[in-house]
């Protein structure tokens, strides 16, 4: 178990907005030295010290659910307060302004949009399975202690396209297309792949997030 500066265990709050199974994320945090806490209210987000926004599903239903639970402004406030924040899969997409997958506006925390992977004769969509990361920002704390080209597990048909390419922390190649696999901007980290399903490499990344939440 990883402890904070005051020697208390590190609690990682996982936002439940009814978009995906949270069990594997919780187990990943447990195995990475943190204490997972599932939260679903504005007040809980306000009290949280570190946050994960996971998600499996589609862009529009996710944004509608965040609105229904009145979580949009609390998430924005938490990020502006510099709380450690990790988005996973759909949780990465929602940080941006819009998506080709729907008509709802995203959180708009990062400038850019979400695009669909283009069809090619030799690839399948969704991009599903193990693939190697290209670490475009090797200084990103998530990669601390990892090899140069780690293998991680993907399941997605869409990818984020930031207006500022400097926020891209890793990319992945599917067919002839190189797409965003992770972003890092100030206290915001987000990954397209599933670290909780990426064996020891993914657990190492989650451990790095828990460690970052101590600071």
Curated annotation (Swiss-Prot):
The gene is hisH. IGPS catalyzes the conversion of PRFAR and glutamine to IGP, AICAR and glutamate. The HisH subunit catalyzes the hydrolysis of glutamine to glutamate and ammonia as part of the synthesis of IGP and AICAR. The resulting ammonia molecule is channeled to the active site of HisF. It holds the Pfam family GATase. GO terms for molecular function: glutaminase activity; imidazoleglycerol-phosphate synthase activity; lyase activity. Coiled coil: none annotated. One of its GO terms (biological process) is L-histidine biosynthetic process. This is Imidazole glycerol phosphate synthase subunit hisH. One of its GO terms (cellular component) is cyanelle. It catalyses: 5-[(5-phospho-1-deoxy-D-ribulos-1-ylimino)methylamino]-1-(5-phospho-beta-D-ribosyl)imidazole-4-carboxamide + L-glutamine = D-erythro-1-(imidazol-4-yl)glycerol 3-phosphate + 5-amino-1-(5-phospho-beta-D-ribosyl)imidazole-4-carboxamide + L-glutamate + H(+); L-glutamine + H2O = L-glutamate + NH4(+). Its EC number is 4.3.2.10, 3.5.1.2. Its main location: plastid. Keywords: Amino-acid biosynthesis, Cyanelle, Glutamine amidotransferase, Histidine biosynthesis, Hydrolase, Lyase, Plastid.
